[in-house]
Design a protein with these regions (language model features):
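Glycine-rich phosphate-binding loops of nucleotide-dependent enzymes
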Residues: 1-122
Length: 122
């Protein structure tokens, strides 16, 4: 129940996973991993297919896990605003090659990242 409370799902403890919303199901998947008490949590596209509200809640959950539990999270994500809002260090790849690596403010200013992911010209 502690993990469900952390996830904000305690009120849905009796709901079958198949009846949860997409966002709640993704949070439950994180909860399953948390049950193993990992030192590092690997997430692949943790906000994929989510509404803006679900995306914000998922990002807040990730930040909470880092801040309150000291959990390290390594994640892949195409929503650059989510990345810039959460990550302390970012590695950006394009076509299998690293095009930038650094702190969020450095990566955001990188001209290759701007051209490829942020829609600005070189």
């Amino acid at each position: 129940l502690r993990i469900l409370e952390t996830l904000g799902l305690a009120d849905q403890a009796d709901v079958r996973a198949g009846h949860l919303s997409h966002g709640d199901l993704k949070r439950l998947e994180i909860g399953i991993a948390l049950g193993m008490e990992p030192e590092l949590l690997l997430l692949d596209e943790p906000t994929a297919g989510m509404s803006p509200e679900e995306t914000a809640a998922q990002a807040a959950l990730m930040q909470k896990l880092v801040a309150e539990q000291g959990l390290n999270i390594l994640f892949t994500e195409h929503d650059m605003e989510v990345v810039f809002g959460i990550a302390k260090s970012i590695t950006v790849m394009h076509q299998g090659r690293v095009i930038a690596d650094g702190r969020p403010n450095e990566v955001r200013r990188d001209r290759h990242v701007q051209a490829v992911y942020l829609g600005e010209e070189l």
